[in-house]
Amino acid sequence: MKTKLNSSNMQLLLFVFLAWDPARLVLANIQEDEAKNNITIFTRILDRLLDGYDNRLRPGLGDSITEVFTNIYVTSFGPVSDTDMEYTIDVFFRQKWKDERLKFKGPMNILRLNNLMASKIWTPDTFFHNGKKSVAHNMTMPNKLLRIQDDGTLLYTMRLTVQAECPMHLEDFPMDAHSCPLKFGSYAYTTSEVTYIWTYNASDSVQVAPDGSRLNQYDLPGQSIGKETIKSSTGEYTVMTAHFHLKRKIGYFVIQTYLPCIMTVILSQVSFWLNRESVPARTVFGVTTVLTMTTLSISARNSLPKVAYATAMDWFIAVCYAFVFSALIEFATVNYFTKRGWAWDGKSVVNDKKKEKASVMIQNNAYAVAVANYAPNLSKDPVLSTISKSATTPEPNKKPENKPAEAKKTFNSVSKIDRMSRIVFPVLFGTFNLVYWATYLNREPVLGVSP
């Protein structure tokens, strides 16, 4: 009985499989036919759209103004060059407008196309007013996107890298802030033909990727948008402006310039604590610190454009240079008023000893001559010879030697100028630093936003 049931089940499964397989094949063929039909439909739609389409003429020519809605997505911002006053930015530049000639009806509401279709239709002739160099990426294919909605609305996106000018005012350098503009608009069409409009508000029309900053010396706190109209000999044109706000980081310059300047000034003031007679040591301190400040001032200017005004760092270096040079002038003044005298107060004792030794030598020489003259008579008379041998040789009267006075080294007293400088110089330098840093660090950054 069980055998009969199993065989019937197997027959049923085989029947279902044989019945389903043709149905599956039929369904696959239907889907394939639908795909082919869709491709055929879209091909016909595109052919119909381009049939009689003149991409030399803007939409609404003679009837209305073409409105181009724009927004920017920044994928990479930086680097910023202070010497050239320019910056580099990598963006997805998006433009949207409506072309009544490209309306269509089909199974889909949006046609997603690539750059090949973009070259066959009218697109805005947008260019960057302050761009020095612009590159449209073409690897591995041109990085362009085109979408056409059924109502004729087009979305055109390009990936661009732009080197743009960034005017900088460096009076507060390195505590400065800047606003780098990105200006763009139509090259040929005036405001009566084509106008540009930001798609969203300020925070959404220009967006920066979270990891898009490529800045070592700046922070990018935010951005803003604007719009203006400029006049030229050929008409009025709409100019869209996106401002990128930059705030410089001061840490690098504190380590590279400010701390060495402060340490050099402190080193120059060490000479006030040396004796006024230490001319070589104090000269080395003065000359070395002056040369060090000169080197620091030159190196600080190498990273800046050759502007005709003084920056905040220039003022700091100039004041430090004045302190160092004043320390050298102070030593010259002290040295000029230093009294000149013998270095040892035992000189008179030394001279007396030399005179005493000279008189003893003269007496000894006289006695030796007298003995030599009397010697022949002594040899003739044996009695006198015996007496002379037994006689003691007279010695000159010597004064008891007094212990020479101890030679003590004498110094001039500490100069009043040095005493005053030990207090005045540090106090003045500390006051200057307090005023300088309080002024610049508490100052609100002024962003030079161009209209």
From Swiss-Prot:
Disulfide bonds join C166-C180. It comes from Bos taurus. Its main location: membrane. Glycans are attached at N38, N138, N201. Keywords: Cell membrane, Cell projection, Chloride, Chloride channel, Cytoplasmic vesicle, Disulfide bond, Glycoprotein, Ion channel, Ion transport, Ligand-gated ion channel, Membrane, Postsynaptic cell membrane, Receptor, Signal, Synapse, Transmembrane, Transmembrane helix, Transport. Alpha subunit of the heteropentameric ligand-gated chloride channel gated by gamma-aminobutyric acid (GABA), a major inhibitory neurotransmitter in the brain. GABA-gated chloride channels, also named GABA(A) receptors (GABAAR), consist of five subunits arranged around a central pore and contain GABA active binding site(s) located at the alpha and beta subunit interface(s). When activated by GABA, GABAARs selectively allow the flow of chloride anions across the cell membrane down their electrochemical gradient. This is Gamma-aminobutyric acid receptor subunit alpha-2. It catalyses: chloride(in) = chloride(out). The lineage of its organism: Eukaryota, Metazoa, Chordata, Craniata, Vertebrata. One of its GO terms (biological process) is chloride transmembrane transport. The chain crosses the membrane at residues 250-270, 281-300, 312-332, 421-441. The keyword Membrane applies. 4-aminobutanoate binds at R94, T157. Residues 1-28 form the signal peptide. Activated by pentobarbital. Inhibited by the antagonist bicuculline. NCBIfam families: LIC.
